[in-house]
Each structure stands twice: as structure tokens, then as C-alpha cells.
């Protein structure tokens, strides 16, 4: 279980640009949950992910995984058990290296590893089998620099690399936002397949209401650092895009934005 307890985060404290993102923010995510997080710009969605991953520090509160306090644990140590896929496909891969080299680095995350020793040849067939399952033809492009792939191919590779090793959480930071609609659908289907097969607890930030409704067992809507909608299972299944849009419109009227 992931727990965020009494989180406070203020950007630019003591300046004219001071902004309080979270004040006494609390959230629990159960093992195996697939949570879709939606909300307007500036609502705290990405800050939430950054706090979980250790990319930014909090001013007070605690972050716990299965009861262990990881509040002050370095980001690189958290990433041994957390996989993250970003909106920009280039952030999850090394563009100058080929597919096999990228997968080998991901395969050895958290281990003592040196590329000069070469890639374990016994793993190459394993990597190709993973690529073949994607149905994107990448198994025939293993020697091509990743930077030469399409955005969708790179994002699919990023998703595979993020989940190659056993992990506790998968963090998806608007990972389909930069893709065309057809490619985004392909990536979402792949995402759902991987999440189901691995049973990994997943938090997905998205602006696509269709995906937020269609995928996962829980949906959160955030506004100004607060969760204003939290539905799961049957309640989520009965929620429509129109319901979400009505809430967005209500917020716009109440807060004038």
C-alpha cells in the first residue's frame, strides 16, 4: 500500500511567487489498484507523482510504502521499485543507443553493470520475444538507434523498459499525450495488458477523459491540491465522461477558471 500522510508542499516559499500545492494532503492507494488521475492544469497531478517518486522534496508529512517511511529516500533508490513513463518518449530511453542496449540497461537496473563488459547474449533472445509481443515490428529493428524510432515505438519501448524488473509501482505521467490518437490507443491497450499481466499498482495522470473512464479500477479528480472526486470499482464503472465534464464546469463557475 502507498500512503501519503499530511503532505505539505510550497513552491518558492517566502517570495512573491509562493504557491501552496498541498496542505494536509492525504491519499492511500491499495496494492493492485490502477488509478487514473485527472484535473485541470496546476491542480497538483504532476507534483503528486514527483513526490511519490522522490523527484521533489516535501515540506512536511510522510510517504510510506507498505508501512515503510520512504520520505527521505533518494529518488534513484526509489526507482529500484518504481517504474515511470513520461509524456516525452525521449525521457525513458537513450536515443543514441540501440534497442537491445536500452533494454539491457533497463534489465540491469539496480545492479552492478558496465556496458564495456558487453550485453549478456543469453538475454538477447528474451528481449526479442518481448519486442515481438508488442506487434510493432521492433524485433527486426534491434540494431537501430532508439532516436530513429517513431514516438509511439519509443513510448512502447519505454513502457516495456519501465516494467522489465519486478516493481511495486508504475507511474504514468501523461504517457499518451504526445501521441496521435491511433498510436495512443495502441499504447493504452499495451499499458492495460502489462498492468494486468504483472499485477502492478499503477497511477496514471491523464487529460484524456475517455482513458480515465475506460481503464483502471479507480478515478481521482484533483483541484488546487485537493481530491474532489474519488470513485472506484462499481461507482467508477457507472461514471460517464459527461459526469466528469459537469464537475469540471461546476468548478470553473465556482472558482472562476
Each language-model region and where it sits:
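ABC ATPase C-loop
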Residues: 162-163
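Conserved ABC transporter NBD signature motif
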Residues: 61-69, 229-231
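Conserved beta-strand-loop-alpha-helix hinge in the C-terminal portion
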Residues: 226-250
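H-loop/switch region of ABC-family ATPase nucleotide-binding domains
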Residues: 206-207
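Helix-to-loop junction immediately C-terminal to a conserved catalytic motif
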Residues: 53
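The feature captures the beta-strand-to-loop junction immediately N-terminal to the Walker
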Residues: 38-40
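ABC ATPase NBD coupling module
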Residues: 69-83, 91, 113-114, 120, ...
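A short, flexible loop at the N-terminus of ABC-type nucleotide-binding domains that lies
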Residues: 1, 10-24, 74
Amino acid at each position: 500500500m502507498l500512503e501519503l500522510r499530511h503532505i505539505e508542499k510550497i513552491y518558492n516559499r517566502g517570495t512573491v511567487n509562493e504557491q501552496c500545492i498541498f496542505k494536509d494532503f492525504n491519499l492511500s492507494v491499495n496494492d493492485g489498484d490502477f488509478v487514473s488521475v485527472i484535473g485541470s492544469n496546476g491542480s497538483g497531478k504532476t507534483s503528486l507523482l514527483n513526490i511519490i517518486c522522490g523527484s521533489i522534496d516535501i515540506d512536511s508529512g510522510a510517504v510510506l510504502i507498505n508501512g515503510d517511511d520512504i520520505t527521505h529516500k533518494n529518488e534513484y533508490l526509489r526507482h529500484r521499485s518504481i517504474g515511470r513513463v513520461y509524456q516525452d518518449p525521449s525521457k525513458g530511453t537513450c536515443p543514441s543507443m540501440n534497442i537491445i542496449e536500452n533494454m539491457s540497461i533497463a534489465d540491469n537496473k539496480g545492479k552492478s553493470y558496465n556496458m564495456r563488459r558487453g550485453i549478456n547474449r543469453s538475454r538477447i533472445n528474451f528481449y526479442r520475444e518481448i519486442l515481438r509481443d508488442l506487434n510493432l515490428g521492433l524485433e527486426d529493428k534491434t540494431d537501430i538507434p532508439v532516436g530513429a524510432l517513431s514516438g509511439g515505438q519509443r513510448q512502447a519501448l519505454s513502457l516495456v523498459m519501465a516494467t522489465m524488473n519486478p516493481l511495486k509501482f508504475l507511474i504514468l505521467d501523461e504517457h499518451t499525450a504526445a501521441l496521435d490518437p491511433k498510436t495512443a490507443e495502441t499504447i493504452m491497450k499495451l499499458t492495460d495488458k502489462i498492468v494486468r499481466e504483472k499485477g502492478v499498482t499503477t497511477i496514471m495522470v491523464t487529460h484524456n477523459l475517455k482513458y480515465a473512464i475506460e481503464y483502471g479500477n479507480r478515478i481521482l479528480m484533483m483541484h488546487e491540491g485537493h481530491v474532489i472526486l474519488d470513485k472506484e470499482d462499481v461507482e467508477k464503472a457507472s461514471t460517464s465522461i459527461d459526469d466528469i465534464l459537469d464537475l469540471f464546469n461546476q468548478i470553473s463557475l465556482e472558482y472562476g477558471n
